[in-house]
């Protein structure tokens, strides 16, 4: 039966899960257009973070039945509340490194990466100097551009290209920092191939730091 509530509220539970990839993309666009035309409030349930990011005006990220974060797709992507959200939202996922904060640097094994002044002040102010911590950074915030390497020399690491995947406009470059694997999203104009030794730099203004015990973002 129709009611005022049913006219303004719709719930869709993984409606695209059984479609092939191409049709899923097409149907995403159709659902978005339908939603804007009908102006209904729709709760869309999905395990596909790409669907969530592209279709939602607001996201509710849940784990084991508990809400982890609520916000716009942009805010959730750029400011994840914890390691779970950072690792779930985004493809490829956020990179995570275990290490320590030491006198303005993030240290993982023999690698030292200089913190931005803002992050150094935040972490020192919260008492994390000398403590174990989790450092997170998105693949697109790791660069092989010569200008970036020159501009931020204290954020540069030596990297061996374990795997290099060309996706068209970009390379997905897989390497390791210490024993921790990570992926960098590099412009395809760079001349890269598997097996190379290269240098990469981390944009530490885009870095996130998480408490090792709680896995919550430090802010």
Each predicted region: which residue ranges?
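Helical segment within the ABC ATPase nucleotide-binding domain
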Residues: 24-39
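Single conserved hydrophobic/aromatic residue that forms the stacking wall/gate
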Residues: 1-5, 9
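Conserved ABC ATPase "signature" C-loop
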Residues: 64-65
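Short acidic-hydrophobic catalytic motif
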Residues: 74-78, 86
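Glycine/charge-rich catalytic "coupling/switch" loops of P-loop NTPases
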Residues: 105-162, 190-219
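Conserved H-loop
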Residues: 39-46
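Hydrophobic Walker B segment
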Residues: 53-56, 88
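Short, glycine/charged-rich "phosphate-handling" switch motifs in NTP-dependent
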Residues: 58, 70, 79
């Amino acid at each position: 039966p129709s009611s005022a509530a049913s006219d303004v509220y719709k719930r869709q539970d993984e409606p695209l899960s059984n479609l092939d990839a191409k049709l899923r993309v097409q149907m995403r666009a159709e659902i978005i257009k339908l939603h804007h035309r009908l102006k209904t409030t729709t709760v869309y349930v999905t395990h596909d973070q790409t669907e969530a990011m592209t279709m939602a005006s607001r996201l509710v990220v849940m784990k084991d039945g508990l809400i982890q974060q609520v916000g716009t797709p942009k805010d959730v992507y750029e400011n994840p509340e914890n390691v779970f959200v950072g690792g779930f939202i985004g493809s490829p996922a956020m990179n995570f490194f275990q290490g320590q904060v030491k006198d303005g640097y993030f240290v993982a094994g023999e690698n030292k990466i200089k913190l931005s002044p803002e992050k150094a002040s935040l972490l020192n102010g919260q008492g994390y100097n000398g403590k174990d911590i989790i450092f997170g950074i998105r693949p697109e915030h790791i660069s092989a551009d010569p200008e970036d390497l020159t501009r931020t020399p204290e954020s540069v690491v030596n990297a061996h290209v374990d795997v290099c995947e060309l996706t068209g406009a970009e390379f997905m470059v897989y390497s390791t920092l210490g024993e921790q694997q990570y992926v960098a999203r590099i412009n395809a104009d760079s001349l890269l191939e598997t097996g190379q030794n290269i240098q990469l730099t981390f944009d530490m203004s885009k870095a996130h730091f998480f408490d090792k015990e709680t896995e919550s973002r430090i802010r």
